Amino acid sequence: MRREVMALVAVLAGAVEAFPRAARAQATGVPSFNAPYRAFQRSELGAVFSFPEGGGTAFEGVYRYAHGKFDIGLRGGFFSPGNGANTVVLAGVEARQRVITHTMDFPLDGALMVGAGANLVSGGSALIIPAGLSLGRRIDPQGSTVSIVPYVQPTFAFIVGDFPSDLVFGFGVGADFRLSRVLDARISGGLGDRPLTGVSIGGVWVH
């Protein structure tokens, strides 16, 4: 099972590296995407590290909670571009709604993802409004306590700010790993349009 997990992580990282013009597509503009399932009954709390292609590191705290058929996520943190550039403040909100359940004819589950967020920095602030569809399916390997949700998330994002507005398309690729009843590990990356590409790695405590 460990070999299977490591192989999947390597494939995801390699796919992101193979496409040099990927987009940041989520609410705060980092390549952190979402599986079609929520991993929690009430809420989850965790952290995400993102590594854009151009350098620098983003760190975000994330909190997501159930609200009827929706779950709503709040995220905020900082992006440090390095090379003496100003640190960017990140803040955003996301919502997920399950809209597709797998059948004999269509083997994937799906959820609609929408959000809004901001990158705040002097002379380069941006408002990001993404909308996408996450498609995937949970895999429960026999004899293992670890389950995996590989998924894709095609996403459009409207970006407006201290520069000409733009509509970009990103193709998210990721996997969620249920390591225990209370712990999830996550990796994702974006393919598609610029401005940024990279990978995100996170962990959450689920309740």
Report each predicted region and the residues it spans.
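Bacterial N-terminal signal peptides that target proteins for export
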Residues: M1-L8
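C-terminal segment of classical bacterial N-terminal signal peptides
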Residues: G14-A22
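Short glycine/proline- and aromatic-enriched beta-strand/turn motifs that initiate or cap beta-hairpins
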Residues: R21-S80
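Outer-membrane beta-barrel transmembrane domain signature
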Residues: T28-A35, P52-G55, T103-D105, M113-H207
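A generic structural signal for ordered secondary structure
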Residues: Q41-A47, A95, G172-D176
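Mid-chain, structured segments of secreted extracytoplasmic proteins
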Residues: D71-F106
